[in-house]
């Protein structure tokens, strides 16, 4: 089954390492830490690359639908909704990034 899934994320640019996992805020958003700076779309590109790896989908399956210039973002990802939801829940439960 192929469909679309909406990801709620919080980006941490200029991090010491790239990592996807943990939650921040209320309602909880998935934390995506990237080494890239928030300049000229570099962080957005790095975020999508890290999410593609974490969810095992292609980079082209992601679309930023809200928050292109902010740290809180909503992304639409094409794929199996049940698998994406399960992976999202799994990543949300990982320890918070410091």
List the predicted regions and their residue ranges.
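The alpha-helix within a helix-turn-helix
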Residues: 52
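Contiguous, often N-terminal, cationic amphipathic patches that form binding interfaces
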Residues: 1-41, 45-49, 57-59, 63-69, ...
């Amino acid at each position: 089954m192929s469909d679309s899934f909406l990801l709620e994320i919080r980006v941490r640019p200029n991090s010491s390492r790239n990592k996807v996992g943990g939650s921040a805020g209320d309602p909880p958003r998935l934390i995506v830490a990237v080494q890239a700076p928030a300049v000229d779309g570099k962080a957005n590109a790095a975020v999508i690359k890290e999410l593609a790896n974490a969810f095992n989908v292609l980079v082209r399956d992601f679309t930023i639908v809200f928050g292109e210039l902010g740290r809180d973002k909503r992304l639409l990802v094409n794929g199996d909704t049940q698998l994406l939801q399960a992976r999202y829940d799994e990543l949300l439960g990982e320890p918070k990034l410091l």
